């Protein structure tokens, strides 16, 4: 019985005490528990309780909190009850707490506290019990109240035989696998009982999977609710076509809204048996020979192609940039051969050139691969090579003369790669579904070995050979646009926009679009560009701002966050924007504001200083490849030296702005918290 964890000596009526905040309460609670000999180290216990609260609040029911302690400091399992007066617990509903159940558990034994949470949750979801328990002032009063409502409990579920189909099944899982996991379960079951619904809820907590759903449960349910705050195995739910994904908090606070989604068939069928965890799985899962949800698959296919392309960009771009660095002594008199005079520089330049020449074919091929799997690779590569200008058909862009069989000296670049990859996939689908579908069984074996690779690729290449003409002009227009935007007047605006995009979603589609634009500018202009410099410098700003804020004011971050915050120095200097993601997730408003403002400033300054770089990646380690083309600064050495100095100025100013916003927000938030505590 879960009430056996309660005891008279662990009921504390502290309604006359005042606490600065919940951490002040936890400190005093740890001291009181050590005096009662249920823990042996109040400091260790306090740190464990504090860490748990910093992960996610345990104030999950109106006016009640369930902090839990799982630590080596616990001598024996216990539940301590604290009666307090309107303590701000930063609860989910933002209401003050009046009653606290502090649960202590041995490190290697979790069943007792899970039993308490599960059973007590059922009582708290009874509105009458929830209102009365907040008024108890003694251990005896609490026990009598629990006994009274335990006697009145009825079965939560109707008999299995009464219905064969569940109204919904659900899985609940939170990061720690304790309170939210079970509260979400109880909230869903209480809602189901109230509305006479037949349900089954599986929990995936610290005690493993309980009440596990079978394949029959899932397949025969009207819908599936995945109330999960962490990744679980989704492959079991593919057969159900009405799957809803929500947080445990949503399931706890608004189970009615969640059920309405199930009831109105607003769910979806999960993509091919599992959520893909990497790009290879994405490509395999999306390799369908049909046009179902094709518009949605296009977006994911392009991102997949970009991810395959990026290693070629980084490798080739950095090697080419290093060749210029090694050949720096010949910069002023090498003319068009700069980067190839020195033998080592020439070797690196040629090797980097091979890698760089493959980025368009790789992009095209893997866009097709992501849509139709392996059959898209051959036509995708071929049209990608045509896009990069490695075939016949030349256009004199100034007068529009087309030389059909002349070696190509123009390219459609990334425009051709994207369109060509999509065209290849579409034609594969058409061939599979309409052209070769009625072949006799004896010929099906050679369809994928001979017919589609040979005739399909020939047709795709011939069609794209013609379609590529307007794409060449589109790419030419982009080159003209970049030349215009590199002017002293418009360059700051270009940098401003790229800086905003780079810092918006840190590795997401908008960030990738800005970065790819910088890479495109490198390829189109065959030289260092402002776009690439703006993308790299502004992408370094978010992690560097966080690191500087942590160095100036440690209290902006939790103790556990500080090592990661300091590590952002290295992440930022290496141009790894993703180092800032954990901090953005935890404090999205302040971090996103700081990132956008600081990144936009950095990008605008990059344009104003006419900074350019030849390398697509590397951060501070490729700063020697920076240069400025500001008027009056002549000579490669001087342009590089001044360029490095101005790049550091851009970073320092942006870091100061970003860290100031983070620190300022922290000061304001803590001032408001102190003011609120005084008023209460």
Curated annotation (Swiss-Prot):
Membrane topology: Multi-pass membrane protein
Principal place of residence: membrane
PTS EIIB type-2 domain residues: 168-264
Assigned keywords, A-Z: Cell membrane, Kinase, Membrane, Phosphoprotein, Phosphotransferase system, Sugar transport, Transferase, Transmembrane, Transmembrane helix, Transport
GO cellular component, one term: plasma membrane
Membrane-spanning residues: 306-326, 352-372, 377-397, 410-430, 449-469, 488-508, 530-550, 565-585, 590-610, 643-663
Enzyme active site: 68 (tele-phosphohistidine intermediate), 174 (phosphocysteine intermediate)
Phosphocysteine found at: 174
One GO molecular-function entry: carbohydrate:proton symporter activity
Catalytic activity annotation: D-fructose(out) + N(pros)-phospho-L-histidyl-[protein] = D-fructose 1-phosphate(in) + L-histidyl-[protein]
Catalytic activity, EC: 2.7.1.202
PROSITE patterns xrefs: PTS_EIIA_TYPE_2 (PS51094), PTS_EIIB_TYPE_2 (PS51099), PTS_EIIC_TYPE_2 (PS51104)
An individual GO BP term: phosphoenolpyruvate-dependent sugar phosphotransferase system
Domain PTS EIIC type-2, first and last residues per copy: 298-675
Compartment list: Cell membrane
Domain of life: Bacteria
Domain PTS EIIA type-2: residue ranges: 4-149
CDD domains listed in its UniProt record: PTS_IIA_fru, PTS_IIB_fructose
Sequence positions bearing Phosphohistidine: 68
Domain comment, as recorded: The PTS EIIA type-2 domain is phosphorylated by phospho-HPr on a histidyl residue. Then, it transfers the phosphoryl group to the PTS EIIB type-2 domain. The PTS EIIB type-2 domain is phosphorylated by phospho-EIIA on a cysteinyl residue. Then, it transfers the phosphoryl group to the sugar substrate concomitantly with the sugar uptake processed by the PTS EIIC type-2 domain.
Function: The phosphoenolpyruvate-dependent sugar phosphotransferase system (sugar PTS), a major carbohydrate active transport system, catalyzes the phosphorylation of incoming sugar substrates concomitantly with their translocation across the cell membrane. This system is involved in fructose transport.
Protein name: PTS system fructose-specific EIIABC component
Organism, scientific name: Mycoplasma genitalium (strain ATCC 33530 / DSM 19775 / NCTC 10195 / G37) (Mycoplasmoides genitalium)
Gene: fruA
